[in-house]
């Protein structure tokens, strides 16, 4: 197992140019790509803020999930090659929004973005989601139960 804590990485999360003009990746982002390439199962654990992922996570994706690494456009074609095929993923998402509200009223925008627009676009499947909430009203016993559930999923490789 390899572990990345985005807050500990040294990188500029702002994508300042298009793909063709991108500067070289910082060493921590090179290592992140190596870790993703090495893995057969990816686990993303993060809070849901304003319906989606935190800005730092989005910046990480913008800088790491790149053409030539995670996908490849086909010259003159609408389709693309999914270079992360053969991998699965689990999203562990905490939230203060009640999960039924997030699903049925808001439409799960953050989950959909990660499942389809990021990981699915690159060939990662299946992408399973475990959500934990409402955090701010949860008891220590409930949070302990959530941690055990996440640990059980990890032990099962799911």
Feature names for model-found ranges:
Residues 67-72, 124-128:
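Short, structured loop/turn "capping" segments at alpha-beta junctions
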Residues 6-13, 82, 87-90, 116-135:
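Mobile beta-alpha loop/short-helix "lid" or hinge segments that flank ligand
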Residues 72-121:
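Short, glycine-/small-residue-rich phosphate/pyrophosphate-handling segment
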Residues 1-69, 137-158:
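N-terminal beta1-alpha1-beta2 submodule of the flavodoxin-like/Rossmannoid cofactor-binding fold
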Residues 104-158:
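Glycine-rich phosphate/pyrophosphate-binding loop and the adjoining helix
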């Amino acid at each position: 197992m390899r572990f990345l804590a985005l807050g500990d990485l040294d990188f500029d999360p702002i994508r300042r140019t298009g793909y063709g003009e991108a500067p070289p990746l910082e060493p921590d982002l090179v290592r992140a790509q190596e870790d993703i390439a090495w893995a057969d199962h990816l686990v993303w654990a993060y809070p849901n803020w304003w319906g989606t992922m935190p800005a730092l996570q989005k910046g990480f994706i913008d800088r790491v999930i790149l053409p030539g690494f995670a996908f490849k456009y086909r010259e003159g074609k609408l389709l693309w090659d999914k270079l992360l095929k053969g991998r699965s993923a689990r999203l562990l998402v905490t939230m203060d929004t009640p999960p039924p509200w997030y699903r049925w009223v808001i439409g799960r925008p953050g989950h959909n973005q990660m499942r389809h627009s990021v990981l699915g676009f690159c060939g990662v499947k299946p992408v399973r989601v475990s959500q934990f909430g409402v955090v701010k009203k949860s008891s220590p016993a409930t949070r302990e139960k959530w941690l055990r559930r996440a640990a059980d999923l990890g032990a099962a490789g799911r």
